[in-house]
Amino acid sequence: MLNLTKLHCNGDPEMAKKYNRGVKLAISLAESTPGQFKLIESPVNSFLIVTNLTVEDTVPHATHPPAGEGLDFSCLSLSRLNALDAIVQPGYDNNSLDAQGHQQPPPAGVRSLTKLTKDPYVTYKLTEWMWALRLNKDILINQALKLLGNPSTWTFCHPTDPLPWMWLLFYGPRSRCQEATCVYAKYFSTAGPVLLPPFFYDPGRDIQSFMSQACKFVKYFYDGEGLDSVLKDNNVPFDDSRIAEVLKALPSVSGSGLVLNKSCLLCCIYKQNLTSFHNVPDVSGGCLILQGAERHTDSAIGRSRCQTTGDIILWPSYNINSLVALFKSNEPSINERADTPGH
């Protein structure tokens, strides 16, 4: 038989040693795992080691009897599979899924979470979060009233007198931050406006949703309040009876599915910054992303695991001093952008 070692190695002893070692390894593999590796001699007196990619599974778990033959898997919890299965079921409600992916009705007396607090991230455009810091919302109210006065928007049920609803939302006694030590007050000597969802700072985006949600938020803030407590220490720019009519209409407003923190933007950012240094057990509150503030972030980034999906949520931290300085430098131009279509 032809000496393949001499043929391929040209007398090089080091290469011959490697060649012999490779052949011995191939023979050893073929002998030890005959179902997966085979050594085949080719027509030119060389050898090929062939592997079977579809090798028969002989590991222990393959010998187990199929499910249903006396085995109980009821103790297994597959939260992701349950959540995916619930999505395709009739009557699916994303807000009613529990941590195991099962649909559960909210407990009695507890409001379920809306999309605002369910998403891991809530993004505010530059003009939106700057409006969230402004105390004077007259331009937004006038813009909304102008849109509501257009007959083309009369395709939904909304209050016949929307002004007092918007006044309560933006200027009422419950429209200010309820934190004991408000961060906004440190810079502006007064409690800051409560942070609302992004669409409230852009009525032109969807005026129907704007007004519909405004009614729900007013109910959330003032349900059960008396007229005297609402008007106390507040200068209402119209007749008080219009506020009284709103309070009377609150019981007929559907306020289900709402939960809202009563903090201003700076207080929310302050709390978010704390998560950069501490592990948080629940991220259902949503992480705030401020567009246009990329240069005003700090190096610390927190992270936590979402209990529902198992995903890792990153929490950026913002330099509050820098954000306030940016707000003060851009405040004069907000009025111009608010009057521009699309802003």
UniProtKB/Swiss-Prot annotation:
Protein origin, superkingdom: Viruses
Any Pfam family hit: Herpes_UL95
Matches recorded under InterPro entries: Herpes_UL95
Name under which the protein is recorded: Gene 34 protein
Native species: Alcelaphine herpesvirus 1 (strain C500)
Gene name for this UniProt entry: 34
